[in-house]
Amino acid sequence: SPQIAGYKYADCLGHPSYFVPSEGVNTKTQDTPLALMACKSRYRMHSQLDGTTSHHFANIEDREPCWINPTDAKTRGIESGDVVLVRNKRGALLAGAYVTDRVMPGVVVVHHGAWFAPMDINGRRIDVHGNSNTLTMDVPTSSLACGNIASTALVEVEKWKGELPRVYVYDQPERVL
């Protein structure tokens, strides 16, 4: 639109435009060689319904699944059902590995909406339930819209070693009468 073009925003032109994401398949690094896609889950709406029985349909070891291609899983010694650490410079989470050819090599999927459950483990804060927002950027879609784009990031995935922390997000509060 001429009105939007008149704002002269470099990241929001007056016509439909594609902008290369700041993190994605084409910007991988040695430390973060996998592109994370934080897609919406079919079992909830954002984080709504995560505390209901619907989470049992997909979760692995009570954690959000991490879909990973067989080639990437084999390189990392990961099998379906393993608990994995998904990490980058912004954060880390634990997820249940789901090895599938439904994602292409170099890409992993951790669905959006798991309830946040941070714990300090060996001097590092790790979300033990699989909240993908711990890994994504907090930047707006454009100078005009300022919407949320928290759907991609660069990550590394490794098999979790050590004691598996308990997921506590579904615990009911103590009742005081």
PLM feature segments, named:
Residues 47, 53-67, 71-177:
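Long, contiguous, secondary-structure-rich segments that constitute the structural scaffold
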